[in-house]
C-alpha cells in the first residue's frame, strides 16, 4: 500500500516539475508532434501523423486519420478519415427515392 502511495506522489511530483519547466508545452504550427498529451499541438492546430511522427498543421487533408470534423480541412471526418465534403450521388438518390415513397404512402 505504501509503495503505491509513494509511486503516486513521485509521479505527481515529476509531472509537476516537467509541466513547470515546459517539457510538455504544446507545439506551434510546423513543429514536430506525436498526437499525445505530452507532445500535442497548441490551440486549434492538429497533428498530421506519418507513422509515429508528425507535424502541427491547421487542418488535415483528405485521407488523413482524424477523430473530429473540426480537424479536417473539409470539415468531414467519417470512419476515422478526413473525407471529401461532397455527399456521394448514390446516397442522394437513395434518400430522394425513400422520400418520394414516404410522400406517396402519406397521400
Swiss-Prot record:
Glycans are attached at residues 18, 44, 98. Disulfide bonds join 59-73, 66-77, 72-82. It comes from the Eukaryota. This is Uncharacterized protein SJCHGC06055. It is found in: Secreted. Residues 1-22 form the signal peptide. The presence of a 'disulfide through disulfide knot' structurally defines this protein as a knottin. One of its GO terms (cellular component) is extracellular region. Keywords: Disulfide bond, Glycoprotein, Knottin, Secreted, Signal.
